[in-house]
């Protein structure tokens, strides 16, 4: 790349190695940016030499830092360069992790159509356990291949296109480009396995060279009170599937579960909703402990009280004892984003009260959490009926 960068002035920065290195890095970043934006801007494909992923960029930054350290120039290395390294480590080339969300019936319909054309199997005629078992075997074996798209409906093609774009963006932008794939209205373990199957057809999950690969994080969303009450058998069935457990282990052995506050509140009232959510969190963490996996709860709340809103600090502290383990995740409704994060002062305040609440709620990691009075549990259950 040196000839291309300095083709007009080959001796530029000849005696300034750091500036010369930074000029090459800047050129590589431009090539990377042009490659990513080419489909959007309909421009020409850039030449070779850009960064393939943020780790290559970080490697160059670390190289400069270590060189400065070796020359006893720690002050320079720990100033603006350190800030840039932290930005690159935190945000990569993607800035944020984009979460995706789709309703469960779209996946069921897509899977049924694909299996009908590819394997002449009537998916909808199978029982719940048969669906889970068959999908697990197909993901593990890679036996099912995508049929000709001309045979598929527009809805199924649109569903598959999401996974195709995920695969492409992970390769072209960053492996961290996407966060979680949320399945709304999750009623059964097969709804999670359907997403895993569709992801495997597009190269996001399965087996490669006899090793499990899971480049998608699936987050089932339990929204109604009935679904919250059945969360235990759904997770037990899911985590009993050997294929799903293997892929989960290959991607960090962490499972995210999203809990819906708005729909459960409309379904049974605010109090019944809150208590069902409380019990669901306790049951989910009990399953996680018994299965040896890590659980992160994603709280779909915010805004008005009916939608699970409330002060951030107190809300986190109200989670069941022992269920917050150093991390939490919750939504912020559009109507409150402006008031909370419109200027740096209020944004810093909101993040501060959230972090302090998280630290307090995570004390169970270093000390035994207090036990909840059984009389309280009995009274709360009676009131929620």
Give the residues covered by each predicted segment:
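Structural motif corresponding to the C-terminal cap of alpha-helices
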Residues: 72, 167-177, 199-206, 239-243
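Extended active-site and interfacial segments that coordinate phosphate-rich ligands
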Residues: 113-115, 199, 236-237
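A structural signal for short, well-ordered beta-strand segments and their strand-loop junctions
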Residues: 90, 182, 297-299
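Glycine- and acidic
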Residues: 43-50, 63-70, 143-154, 173-185, ...
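Conserved structured core elements
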Residues: 51, 55-58, 62, 75-82, ...
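Catalytic or ion-translocation cores adjacent to nucleophile or general acid/base/metal-coordination motifs
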Residues: 202-383
């Amino acid at each position: 790349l040196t000839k291309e960068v300095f083709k007009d002035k080959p001796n530029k920065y000849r005696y300034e190695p750091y500036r010369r290195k930074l000029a090459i890095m800047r050129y590589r970043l431009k090539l990377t940016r042009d490659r990513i934006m080419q489909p959007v801007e309909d421009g020409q494909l850039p030449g070779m030499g850009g960064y393939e992923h943020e780790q290559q960029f970080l490697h160059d930054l670390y190289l400069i830092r270590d060189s400065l350290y070796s020359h006893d120039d720690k002050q320079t290395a720990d100033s603006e360069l350190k800030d840039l390294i932290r930005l690159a480590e935190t945000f990569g080339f993607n800035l944020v992790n984009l979460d995706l969300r789709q309703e469960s019936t779209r996946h069921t319909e897509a899977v049924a159509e694909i299996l009908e054309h590819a394997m002449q199997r009537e998916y909808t005629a199978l029982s719940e356990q048969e669906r889970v078992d068959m999908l697990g075997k197909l993901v593990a074996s890679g036996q099912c291949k995508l049929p000709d798209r001309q045979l598929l409906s527009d809805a199924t093609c649109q569903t598959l296109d999401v996974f195709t774009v995920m695969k492409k963006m992970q390769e072209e932008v960053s492996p961290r480009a996407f966060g979680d794939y949320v399945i709304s209205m999750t009623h059964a373990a097969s709804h999670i396995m359907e997403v895993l199957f569709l992801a495997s057809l597009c190269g996001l999950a399965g087996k490669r060279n006899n090793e499990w690969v899971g480049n998608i994080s699936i987050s089932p969303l339990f929204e109604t009170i009935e679904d919250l009450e059945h969360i235990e058998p759904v997770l037990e069935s899911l985590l009993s599937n050997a294929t799903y457990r293997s892929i989960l282990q290959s991607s960090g052995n962490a499972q995210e579960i999203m809990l819906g506050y708005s729909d459960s509140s409309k379904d049974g009232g605010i109090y019944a909703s809150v208590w069902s959510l409380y019990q669901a969190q306790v049951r989910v963490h009990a399953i996680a402990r018994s299965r040896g996996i890590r659980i992160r709860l994603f709280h779909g709340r915010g805004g008005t009280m009916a939608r699970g809103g409330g002060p951030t600090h107190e809300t986190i502290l109200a989670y069941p004892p022992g269920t917050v383990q150093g991390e939490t995740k919750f939504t912020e409704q559009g109507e409150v984003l402006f008031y909370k994060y419109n200027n740096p002062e209020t944004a810093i305040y909101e993040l501060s009260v959230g972090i302090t609440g998280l630290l307090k709620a995570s004390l169970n990691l270093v000390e035994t959490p207090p036990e909840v009075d059984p009389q309280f549990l009995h009274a709360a259950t009676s009131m929620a009926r």
